[in-house]
Structure formats: structure tokens, C-alpha cells
Amino acid sequence: MTAFVRTVLGDIEPSALGVTYAHEHLVIDGGRPVELEPDFDLSNVDAMATEVGAAMELGLGAVVDAMPCDCGRSALKLAELSRRTGLHIVAPTGLHHDRFYGPSHWSHRLNVEQLANLFVADIEDGIDAYDYSGPFVERTQHRAGVIKLGGSEGSLSDRDHLVFGAAAAAHRRTGASILTHCERGTGGLEQVRSLLDGGVTPEHVALSHVDKVVDRGYHRELAATGVALEYDGSFRWGDADNGTLRLLGWMAEDDLLDHVVLGMDAARQGYYTVYGGAPGLTWLLDGFATAMEDRGLGADVRRRLLVDNPARVFAFASIDRGISA
């Protein structure tokens, strides 16, 4: 089968993505995250369309959204945003960190096979219009194109192992790539071991937030497994030396830039200019692009990180349709 990326509006060739942010939050439509942090409310499509438009004027072509099942995901709003702006949006299935659900959430009552079946249904049949908030499920035409997982700080919890096992099974059945959350950047090696032991293709895994750990050896070890490292902390360093830039310099010296993708993980109103925040969705294409240039990381490097690498990482893996979960 020809390689493809599954967007919320349909399948496209990987080369059609263009400049891609690998971990974003364009829509957070209520749910426990907003209950915990009102600043997470990103339910206004009009506002986000304006924000997206400004970034697209600088060349943005695609975004991988990272809000999975029943924690503010809205396939309908993501699809509306994509139609209105022309931005390619990859919608997620999966489960976030446990704190975004609580102890009584339905995800605690499902086993590996049941969770895998739910993820596969999102990918192959369509995402529930009600985002599994219950009691009814009404599948939309908008399908998930990536599996998002949240891991605990340091090491995987028992729940994490269950969810990672389900994600591995869903990957084997569909070929969908996996995007993980590494709490404070930690635990990446254990996450990789869990996924690879479950039969996941390493080239179709991206570990998010790992640039929070500015350790050259850690990043070498992660890259050696074959997975991608998603750096999204570039605007969070304040007056300190920019650790994301330092890591990019090391990865360039070690000839490992093919293992890096970039995002912003902008999950708060305070990060978007339409809400009076900063630095805005344009950051990777203006402020950070300039900072990279000043460090000798020019247009060729930016193309690898923002175009070539995500097109490869988020393309569906070839699978054997005869395998079982």
C-alpha cells in the first residue's frame, strides 16, 4: 500500500503535510483538563482559526493534535478548523495521563483488548461525536491518525503499562504511529522498551517533551532505539540558556537530527496571541527559526525537523492484516 498520513478530513500522501508541528493542542473542548485548569479551554474555533491563519502565512502546513479520548478532544471542531483554514490536522486516539481522568473514569474498567478495540475503532471507523463521554457512541466520518499516550514521571505505572500495551496492539492492527507524553521529559527509555516489546515499529514512535532533560547521553540512547524525539520546550526557557537549542546542536554534531521533530505543546490560552498570550503559534517559524539560524542551524536543518522527519514518522506503518492483537 502507498504510504499515507490520516488527517481528520481524510488520507493524504506524507509529502503533502509540508511544515508540520508534531505535538499541539488546537482544540480542548471542556473535560477534566479544563476543570483542573481553566486556561486549558481552547474550545473557540473562531479564535484558533485566526491563530492558525497567522502561522500558515509563514508556511505552516500541518499539525498533529495531541488531546486523546475523553479529555477535551473534539473531532468535529478539529474538522471544522481544518476545513476553514486548509490546515492538515492529524487527530489522536489513545489516553492521556491518569490525572486528566480521575479514579472513577471508564478507562480504569477496560482491559488491554477492550482499549485496543476502542483505539482501532477511532482509527478505522471514526471518532465518537461525544468523545466517549457516554452513554451513547455516534461515530463521525473523522478518523484518528495517531495514538497519543501519557506516561508517568520516571517510570510507567501499572495503568500506563495497560494503556501502552493496548496502544501497541492497536499499532500492530492499524499501522498508526504513536506519540507519547514523557512527564518532565523522563521515562523515555522504559516507554520505548514497552512499545517495542509490544511489536511497535520504532520509526513510528515519537517521544514528547524529552528536551526538558538536557542530557546528551539520554538523547543519544533514545535516538539509538530508532524512535523520534519531539522537542517542544523551545519557548519555555526564559532567561536561562535555551536547552532545546543546546540539544539540537548536540544532535547535529552527533548526526542524529533525523530523529528529531518539533512542536510547541501549546495547551493554554496564555500561549496564543488571540488570547493576549505569547509567543503564539508562529513561534517555530519566526522567533525560534531566528534563534536556530543564530546557532548555525539553518533552513536545511529546519526542513529536516519540520518537513522531512514528521512526514516519515507520522506515515502509517505497513502491516500484515493477518496478525492478531
Which residues make up each language-model segment?
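Mid-to-C-terminal alpha-helical segments outside catalytic/metal-binding sites
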Residues: 2-10, 283-325
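Alpha-helical scaffold segments that flank or form the walls of functional sites
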Residues: 17-29, 35-88, 113-142
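Divalent metal-coordination and catalytic microenvironments
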Residues: 23, 63, 95, 171, ...
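Active-site beta-loop-alpha junctions enriched in small/polar residues
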Residues: 25-27, 68-69, 94-98, 152, ...
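Histidine/acidic-residue-rich catalytic or RNA/ligand-binding cores of hydrolases
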Residues: 30-34, 75, 101, 188-194, ...
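Active-site gating/metal-coordination segments in enzymes
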Residues: 80-84, 88-90, 94-177, 228, ...
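Catalytic pocket-lining loop regions of alpha/beta-barrel enzymes
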Residues: 168, 172-246, 250, 260
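Short acidic/histidine-rich active-site segments
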Residues: 178-179, 232-234, 256-278
